[in-house]
Amino acid sequence: MRKIILSALAGTAALAATPAFAQDDAQAFNGGHVEAITGYDHISDGDDGILYGIGAGYDFRINNVVLGIEGEVLESTAGDCLGNLCVDAGRDFYIGGRIGAVVAPRVLVYGKVGYSNARVEVTQGNVEDHANLDGIRAGAGVEWQFRNSPLSVRAEYRYTNYELGVERHQGTLGLAFRF
């Protein structure tokens, strides 16, 4: 009889613990986050480079739909030289929104759109100048949150169309801390 009671208590405890895991998954992609970002950067008519920076945002989860706002500050090594004329990509600011669907308990597929401002630095000999370019960024990605952890990783492709016909293609990886 004692074994039956202990087995029943153990089974009840296991069933009671199950909703706790489901609740953790239900809270995935809800709240604030900060992230480190790195990836590939290509600017039209220029050499490829590496981008790196930080981002922050806040997500609102409604059932399996996620709405979010986010911002980023990035730097890039992309640039090109022709003789003594060099054009280098500088910093890149972004602010925008994203909408996504939770397709598995800790997997989010999303699209994003927003405003981007990039600084391009031009050097000819000893003379330096810069220009700020405004543009629209659109992208898509997937984010995976680790089980029972505030960490998530994301992979993303984004395209930005700046004024003066300048285009940018980026492939990024991010490591986010969610709170």
Language-model segments: residues:
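Gram-negative outer-membrane beta-barrel domains
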Residues: 2-5, 19-179
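Cleavable N-terminal signal peptides
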Residues: 8-10, 14, 20
